[in-house]
């Protein structure tokens, strides 16, 4: 796996991808190319070399994690390539209106298309998978299951969730927390930290799991949490949360407010004690949770966040490109 953010390894990977893209374009006359995030840079390079129009889709914020030792040169070089690819693209796609400000700074407003993200999980949950999830994650009768899907960077805010756990357990000692994601080293490091706090037995780290199992886990949970601190665009996982029909507690930050509000989630300040209060509130108020979950699914419907609507919007974008190139 590549580390997050620009790096020598990522640049080398982009060079290989661009070489393959150029070879593919020379072998077959493509009408246009569609690149997503780093793939947009690759499409820009290949498009310039082969005179093939390209669409650059930028799916969200890039917030570098300086604590992981990002090299400033690669960050600057990545930004340079990204800006050139965005400015010269036949069209650019953003996942919400917040991206328009970025595109306007890059002189892309006239050819910017806003296509809202849709939930990534589209699997039907079979009874057998649901039963397996119940057996794996619910270890006691009457247990409250609180789940978070995310990475281990401050950008994602998992530290807020971890620091809220002792507050939740002081009120709901039968609570069980599930944290999806992370590699073995990250999980080992966090398990050791939780052991020092004496709460490691209340937390389950399944790592990265299959999509069908994740869908089942979200559906059987009592509360889903989104502690994301930074960024401006809604994380895809929140859309999966809304689709699952399980109530949400979220940090009141711009990224979460892009799709969540007091209408469809419990919003709290990004403070551990207050985040814990929101979790406990949903654990003790099933009727509130049911109403928030209903409103969450209505939000997806109202904002047309479905595969059918996504394909229709993408068709319109492609039609625009083909009519102007």
Question: Which residues does each PLM region occupy?
Answer:
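Donor nucleotide-sugar binding/catalytic pocket of nucleotide-sugar-dependent glycosyltransferases
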Residues: 75-130, 139, 148, 203-206
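Nucleotide-activated donor-binding/catalytic signature segment of Leloir-type glycosyltransferases, i.e.
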Residues: 188-212
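Conserved donor-binding/catalytic core segment of Leloir-type glycosyltransferases
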Residues: 140-156, 162-165
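Conserved acidic donor-binding segment of nucleotide-sugar-dependent glycosyltransferases
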Residues: 262-273, 281-287
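Membrane-proximal helix-turn-helix segments that form the acceptor-binding/catalytic region
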Residues: 19-26, 41, 45-49, 62, ...
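An aromatic- and histidine-rich active-site surface loop
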Residues: 13-18, 32-50, 55-63, 97, ...
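A charged, aromatic-enriched C-terminal amphipathic alpha-helix characteristic of glycosyltransferases
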Residues: 287-319
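Acidic donor-binding loop of glycosyltransferase active sites
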Residues: 90, 216-233, 246-247
């Amino acid at each position: 796996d590549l580390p997050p953010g620009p790096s020598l390894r990522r640049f080398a990977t982009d060079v290989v991808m661009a070489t393959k893209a150029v070879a593919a374009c020379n072998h077959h006359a493509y009408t246009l190319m569609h690149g997503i995030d780093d793939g947009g840079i690759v499409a820009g390079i290949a498009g310039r070399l082969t005179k093939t129009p390209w669409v650059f889709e930028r799916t969200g914020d890039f917030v570098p994690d300086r604590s992981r030792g990002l090299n400033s040169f690669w960050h600057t070089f990545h930004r340079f390539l990204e800006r050139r690819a965005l400015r010269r693209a036949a069209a650019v796609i953003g996942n919400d209106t917040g991206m328009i400000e970025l595109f306007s700074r890059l002189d892309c407003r006239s050819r910017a298309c806003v296509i809202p993200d849709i939930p990534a999980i589209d699997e039907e949950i079979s009874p057998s998978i649901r039963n397996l999830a119940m057996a794996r994650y619910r270890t006691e009768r009457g247990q409250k299951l609180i789940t978070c899907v995310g990475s281990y960077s401050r950008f994602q805010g998992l530290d807020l969730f971890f620091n809220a756990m002792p507050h939740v357990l002081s009120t709901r000692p039968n609570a069980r927390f599930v944290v999806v994601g992370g590699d073995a080293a990250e999980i080992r490091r966090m398990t050791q930290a939780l052991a020092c706090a004496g709460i490691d037995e209340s937390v389950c780290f399944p790592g990265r799991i299959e999509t069908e199992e994740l869908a089942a886990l979200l559906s059987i949970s009592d509360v889903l949490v989104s502690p994301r601190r930074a960024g401006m665009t809604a994380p895809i996982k929140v859309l999966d949360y809304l689709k699952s029909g399980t109530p949400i507690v979220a940090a009141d930050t711009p990224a979460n407010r892009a799709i969540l509000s007091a209408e469809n989630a419990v919003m709290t300040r990004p403070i551990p004690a207050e985040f814990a209060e929101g979790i406990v509130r949903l654990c003790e108020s099933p009727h509130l949770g049911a109403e928030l979950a209903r409103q969450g699914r209505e939000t997806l419907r109202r904002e047309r966040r479905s595969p059918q609507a996504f394909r229709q919007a993408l068709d319109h974008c492609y039609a625009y490109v083909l009519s102007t190139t």
